[in-house]
């Protein structure tokens, strides 16, 4: 009985997610800038009305920040967008950013900034995996509306290697 309990404890410990989420080693923000399509995501409250055609556009700014425009189509056909700004918080890799969609006047408040960590990235920048260090948020993005099965599997593998539950992903139509 003691052996069974010890074996069970070891198995549960080994099956847990990695202690920390790891980003990619380096991101070229000029190559990363541009338009991305959301291929899959964890369900979240701020995208609850998005029914399809979910996109993100990133544009480098002279001050080093990144202009962010997120857009999606609702089920009634109307388009909504959210404009924000991102800033690099890890200058070594440029893979950890903070993003805010709150008005600039509130930017001094830490809670208006959300984590945007690039945890997977194709060598040719055709797909990216973005998550948060608490593993509550996850997105798979691509330069085209669809990813082929092999590329999607590589993106999911990057998320899974960081302890994200691939079963929670919802794919866009």
Question: Positions of the model-derived regions?
Answer:
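A beta-rich soluble binding module of mature secreted/lumenal proteins
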Residues: 2-3, 10-173
């Amino acid at each position: 009985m003691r052996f069974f309990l010890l074996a069970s404890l070891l198995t549960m410990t080994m099956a847990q997610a990695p202690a920390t989420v790891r980003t990619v080693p380096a991101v070229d923000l000029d190559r990363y800038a541009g338009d991305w399509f959301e291929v899959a995501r964890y369900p979240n409250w701020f995208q609850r009305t998005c029914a399809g055609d979910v996109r993100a556009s990133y544009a480098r700014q002279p001050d080093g920040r990144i202009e962010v425009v997120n857009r999606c189509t609702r089920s009634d056909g109307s388009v909504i967008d959210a404009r924000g700004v991102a800033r690099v918080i890890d200058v070594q890799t440029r893979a950890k950013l903070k993003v805010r969609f709150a008005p600039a006047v509130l930017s001094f408040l830490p809670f208006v900034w959300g984590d945007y960590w690039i945890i997977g990235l194709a060598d040719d920048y055709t797909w990216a995996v973005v998550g948060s260090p608490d593993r509550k948020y996850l997105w798979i993005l691509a330069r085209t509306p669809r990813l082929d099965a092999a590329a999607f599997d590589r993106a999911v593998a990057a998320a899974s290697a960081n302890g994200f539950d691939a079963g929670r992903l919802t794919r866009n139509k």
